[in-house]
C-alpha cells in the first residue's frame, strides 16, 4: 500500500539494496499520492504504478502498466496514466452509473463504479441480504457495487474521486465512519450530542478520522 511505500522511502533501516530485485511496484488499497510515488522512486529507482480492486473482486480489477515502445513505428503505446488506477484487466469491465437509478453516465462524468468480470465474488458467506445489496444483475450480467465514485476517460483509464460508502482507509484498513459515530454516541450517552465523522489525508497512515461535535468531547462532567 502507499502507506508502506512511504515508510520504506523514509526509513533508514530499508536500504536501496533491499528492493534491488524488483522491476516495478504496484500500489493499491488507498490513494497513491504523487509525493509518495516520487519519494519511493527517488530512493529506490523503481517505478510505481497504481492499481485498483476490492476483496470482492479477488482482489484486482485494474492497473497501470509500463508504456511500450514500438521500435518499428517509433510510437509509444500508452498504458500508464498517473492519477488514475489504470485500465480494467482483460475480461473485466467498468460501468459508471447513477447510484440510484443505475443508468449509465457519459464518459468523463462521475458516478458509482460497477465492476463486472469472472473474478466477482459469488457472495458473502451465509449473508444473502448483504450479498443482494452488493451485487446487481443488469441484462443477466453480474456487477459488483463498489461504493466508490469515479469516472472513465476516453482511453478507458479509471479515476476514483470519492467514496459513496462512508469509510476511511487508515493504514490500508477500512474503518466505517458510521460505526465510529455510533460507538462514540453510545459511549457518551448524551441525547443532545450530535457527531459527524470525516477523514483527512495523513502522511503516516494515509487518512485520519476527524470528529465534528456539538459539544466538547474532552470536557469532564
Regions of interest found by a model, annotated:
Residues 29, 53, 86, 148, ...:
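Active-site glycine-centered loops adjacent to acidic/histidine catalytic or metal-binding residues
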Residues 45, 78-82, 120-147, 164, ...:
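Conserved ANL (AMP-binding/adenylate-forming) active-site segment centered on the GW(Y/F)…HTG consensus within
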Amino acid at each position: 500500500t502507499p502507506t508502506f511505500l512511504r515508510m520504506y522511502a523514509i526509513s533508514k533501516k530499508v536500504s536501496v539494496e533491499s528492493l534491488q530485485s524488483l522491476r516495478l511496484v504496484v500500489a493499491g488499497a488507498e490513494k497513491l499520492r504523487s509525493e509518495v510515488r516520487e519519494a519511493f522512486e527517488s530512493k529506490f529507482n523503481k517505478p510505481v504504478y497504481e492499481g485498483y480492486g476490492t476483496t470482492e473482486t479477488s482482489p484486482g480489477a485494474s492497473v497501470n502498466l509500463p508504456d511500450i515502445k514500438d521500435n518499428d513505428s517509433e510510437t509509444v503505446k500508452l498504458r500508464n496514466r498517473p492519477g488514475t488506477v489504470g485500465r480494467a484487466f482483460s475480461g473485466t469491465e467498468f460501468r459508471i452509473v447513477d447510484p440510484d437509478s443505475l443508468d449509465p453516465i457519459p464518459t468523463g462524468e462521475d458516478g458509482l463504479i460497477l465492476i463486472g468480470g469472472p473474478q466477482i465474488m459469488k457472495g458473502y458467506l451465509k449473508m444473502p441480504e448483504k450479498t443482494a445489496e452488493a451485487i446487481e444483475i443488469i441484462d443477466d450480467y453480474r456487477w459488483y457495487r463498489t461504493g466508490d465514485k469515479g469516472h472513465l476517460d476516453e482511453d478507458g483509464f479509471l479515476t476514483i474521486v470519492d467514496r459513496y460508502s462512508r469509510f476511511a482507509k487508515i493504514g490500508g484498513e477500512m474503518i466505517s465512519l458510521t460505526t465510529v459515530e455510533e460507538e462514540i454516541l453510545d459511549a457518551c450517552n448524551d441525547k443532545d450530542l450530535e457527531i459527524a465523522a470525516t477523514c483527512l489525508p495523513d502522511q503516516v497512515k494515509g487518512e485520519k478520522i476527524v470528529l465534528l461535535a456539538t459539544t466538547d468531547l474532552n470536557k469532564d462532567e
